From Swiss-Prot:
Organism: Oryza sativa subsp. japonica (Rice)
Feature: compositional bias, Low complexity: 50-65
Keywords per UniProt: Cell cycle, Cell division, Cyclin
Protein name: Cyclin-D1-1
Biological process (GO), any one: cell division
UniProt keyword annotation of Disulfide bond present: no
């Protein structure tokens, strides 16, 4: 597969136009997700409305464009310059040459079927998630964008270890959030703008693009994950007495989910169980909103969707309680750090949510 790099943005914040010169069918099939590849293989006919060039990932094209600038570098290497910003406003530049794709030793690579996630295995996880939520709040991303970024980061770190440097985890955060924004948002911000003010390390766009490609390869190009937000509205309608109260429940459930993704164990649960537990938690927080129902339990919630079980919902519900209690304690100690967790909706719906807050008892 060959690419031709046409041009770059003046700031270097986005990759230039990449033209596909020669694409072989086998190469395209390898780049597609499993569901897309299945469509191509069905009766030997290509998927409707798709072409080889349109099936290529934007991140892959961007990374390929960046590769043209450094032909002598390793295919999966991350090389460049990192800028560290100190609290005093001074900037320190460091050159680095680190190959993320080649672990130092076999013991650094976890097996494909890794054990359940725990905070012990992920130092700095909470700080990384907080940064993603802060960027989501600044740019007005959808809640699903932040969740996908955290999910990509979790899947990557489940099979690949990073060096013990702050810039490595920060680079992974930026790359995962950039990929998630390209998947969920109608318009993803430039890579330089994605690194908001206050970010400790600032990376060149081409460095982020290389890391995006490494993440894509590690995730086997499967980015279309199911998120809990796909179930929230449906589950909220199951218990809401009206469209308005259902919307209020859905908003609160989304906020609960975003607050809970700091807990690694929460990601062990399937998306539907997360959504059911979050809606159940929102109902129990404001029972006045459910005047037409005497109570909603894990047992009744298990009937909302095929695959839900009372045990899974109860387990997820307990994690939500622990996560929200921990978040409340941290907010009391550091109110500014966790401010990003309080906003759930995008900027277009914030004014509407303010009108709905405090009126759970009205239908």
């Amino acid at each position: 597969m060959m690419y031709k790099h046409v041009g770059d943005d003046a700031r270097g914040s986005s990759a230039g136009v990449v033209c596909c010169v020669d694409v072989v069918d086998d190469d395209v099939d390898a780049l597609l997700c499993g569901e897309d590849a299945g469509e191509l293989e069905r009766e030997g006919e290509p998927a409707q409305g798709s072409s080889p060039s349109s099936s290529l990932s934007c991140a892959a094209a961007a990374a390929a464009a960046a590769d043209d600038d450094d032909e002598d570098e390793d295919e999966h290497g991350v090389h460049g310059e990192v800028v560290q910003v100190t609290p005093g406003g001074e900037e320190h530049c460091y050159d680095y040459d680190y190959d993320v794709d080649v672990p130092v030793g076999a013991e650094l690579v976890m097996p494909a079927c890794s054990p359940p996630r725990t905070a012990v295995h992920r130092p700095g996880w909470s700080e990384s998630v907080s940064w993603i939520l802060k960027v989501r709040s600044v740019h007005g991303f959808q809640p699903a964008t932040a969740y996908l970024a955290v999910s990509y980061m979790d899947r990557f770190m489940s099979s690949r270890s990073l060096p013990d440097h702050g810039w490595a985890s920060q680079l992974l955060c930026v790359a995962c959030l950039s990929l998630a924004a390209k998947m969920e948002e109608s318009s993803a911000p430039p890579l330089l703008d994605l690194q908001i003010e206050g970010t400790r390390f600032i990376f060149e766009p081409r460095t982020i693009q290389r890391m995006e490609l490494i993440v894509l390869v590690e995730l086997d190009w499967r980015l279309r994950s199911v998120t809990p937000f796909a179930f929230v509205d449906f589950f909220a309608c199951k218990v809401g007495s009206s469209g308005r109260s259902s919307r209020i429940l859905a908003l609160r459930a989304c906020q609960i989910i975003l607050s809970a993704i700091h807990e690694l164990e929460f990601l062990n649960h399937c998306a539907s169980s997360m959504a059911a537990a979050a809606v159940l938690f929102a109902v129990n927080e404001s029972p006045a909103a459910m005047s037409h129902r005497s109570s909603v339990s894990s047992e009744s919630a298990a009937s909302w969707c095929i695959g839900l079980t009372e045990e899974r919902i109860s387990s997820c519900y307990q994690l939500l309680q622990r996560a929200l209690n921990a978040t409340a304690r941290k907010r009391k100690r550091h109110p500014m750090i966790l401010a990003a967790c309080s906003s759930v909706t995008s900027s277009s719906s914030r004014s509407k949510r303010r009108k709905l807050d405090g009126h759970f008892g009205e239908d």
